[in-house]
Amino acid sequence: MSSAPEPFTHAIASRDGLFFANRYRFALVAEGQFFGLTLRGDELYCFEAGDQPWVPSRLGRIVRFRRSGDCVGERDILVEGLDNGCHQIDFFAGSCFVVDTYNQLILEYDSDWQLAATHQPVPPVRLGETGHDYFHINSFLGLGDSIFLLLHNGRLERPSEILEVDCAFRERRRIPLLERACHDVVRLEEGGFLVCNSLHGSLIDAHGTVVEIDALMTRGLSVGKDEIAVGSSLFGARPVRSLIPGFVTFLDRAYRKTARLHLPAAPTQIRRLDGVDLSLSCPAE
């Protein structure tokens, strides 16, 4: 009798579907173009773009999937009419926060999925503006009385920054990083940060390179108690990004590579299915 396959450990959002995966296999569980991904128990919440991210058609939405084993049920639509270019979403302090990247806003939704507040941690911009005030915020992490936002800064041709704000989104400090165009922000147990140095295929902290992953673009970072998962893919022109495949590289907490999985789509976000994940603002115990 053959043994049952190992259960999936991670959920992976991508431009071409939502996947479940572990170190050995993956499965497509939902069609769609997904960017942000978070979870509560067996419920997964995603930002889904209904059009190309740079198109101002406002077909973005927040959807929920209920997980049952290796599958999910039909999507529940919770919020509609969002900009297609939104990125990460996460629960923190009783609300769900959405990073409205192209408009440089943080949207806060209450438990009834009503818009409770629109926050401006940096000066807002109009869709499509790329001037000296466009930072391309792409990641959100709430901890204690602070919120950490990742400023990509790619078009500014200057290093990315971790922007720390209070819960009223007033700036406390900026932490400069090694390179521009970074993604994801995780705070480790000892207080240091871990970030995807996307253009150099590595993970970095506030001081330098922690580990080289590959020669691709790193994006999507999950940090569990014993295992790290990092997404990577080629960097393509906008019209073809949904066609580009990708990888998930698994490492132990000493940053030694333990496995590598080839996916048919480029990861945009990775979360542990058990919720014990430092990439979440409210990780499970």
Question: Where do the protein language model's features map onto the residues?
Answer:
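Conserved beta-strand positions in repeat-built beta-propeller and related beta-rich domains
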Residues: 1-4, 10-15, 46-57, 98-103, ...
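Short coil/turn segments that connect the beta-strands within blades of beta-propeller domains
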Residues: 6-9, 41-42, 93-95, 144-146, ...
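Blade-loop segments of beta-propeller domains
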Residues: 27-90
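Repeated scaffold domains used in trafficking and secretory/extracellular systems
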Residues: 31-42, 83-91, 132-139, 180-186, ...
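Surface-exposed loop and turn segments in beta-propeller and other repeat-based domains
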Residues: 72-82, 114-135, 174-178, 261-278
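Loop/turn-rich, solvent-exposed surfaces of beta-rich toroidal or solenoidal domains
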Residues: 179-188, 192-248
